[in-house]
């Protein structure tokens, strides 16, 4: 099961997985796994020396390519609640604001993995409608499919 909604500065994606939250969260707590969950068209590359496990206040530097333009991005882990949720916030990158909450909710089928993003862009509604929304749909659809492959 997969649900995706993107509307003017907010994105919501949920994926039902057959594994429980502790196993799924463990995968997410290794920043090297970001590469696995990121579509190749973004040309994602981690630039930071990473710890074994992500923790509160960690900063992760990486580079992506948006429309063939290389962009440096730095995220900071601002919430870390093991097996339940964490939040990464862009502190350097292409958005005016990017706050990405990852939730893991156990249920009778395993766990529901939820991505909630609140974002603001520099050039407003038209750029969001023409470019950002479509790219986020591609990114989160890829991510949901990859999570299903790994945990179903």
Annotate each PLM feature:
Residues 45-92, 145-150:
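Glycine-rich portal/gate segments that line the openings of hydrophobic small-molecule binding cavities
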Residues 21-22, 53, 79-85, 103-112:
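A short, structured loop/turn motif at beta-sheet edges
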Residues 87-138:
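Beta-strand/loop substructures that line and gate deep hydrophobic ligand-binding cavities in soluble
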Residues 13-15, 73-79, 90, 99-106:
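Hydrophobic/aromatic beta-strand elements that line small-molecule binding cavities or substrate pockets
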Residues 24-28, 34, 60-62, 77, ...:
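Hydrophobic pocket/interface hotspot
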Residues 138-146:
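A non-catalytic, amphipathic alpha-helix used as a structural packing/dimerization or gating element
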Residues 1-51, 55:
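Hydrophobic ligand-binding cavity/cleft-lining segments
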Residues 17-19, 66-68, 79, 94, ...:
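Beta-strand elements of well-folded, non-transmembrane domains
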């Amino acid at each position: 099961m997969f649900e995706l909604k993107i509307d003017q500065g907010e994105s919501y994606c949920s994926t039902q997985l057959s594994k429980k939250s502790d196993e799924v969260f463990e995968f997410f707590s290794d920043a090297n796994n970001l590469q696995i969950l990121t579509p190749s068209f973004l040309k994602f590359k981690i630039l930071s020396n990473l710890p074994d496990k992500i923790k509160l206040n960690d900063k992760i530097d990486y580079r992506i390519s948006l429309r063939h333009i290389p962009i440096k991005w730095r995220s900071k882990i601002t919430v870390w609640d093991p097996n339940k949720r964490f939040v990464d916030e862009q502190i350097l990158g292409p958005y005016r604001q990017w706050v990405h909450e990852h939730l893991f909710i156990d249920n009778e089928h395993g766990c529901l993995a939820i991505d909630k993003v609140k974002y603001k862009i520099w050039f407003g509604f038209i750029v969001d409608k023409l470019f950002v929304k479509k790219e986020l749909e591609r990114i989160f659809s890829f991510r949901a499919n990859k999570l299903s492959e790994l945990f179903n």
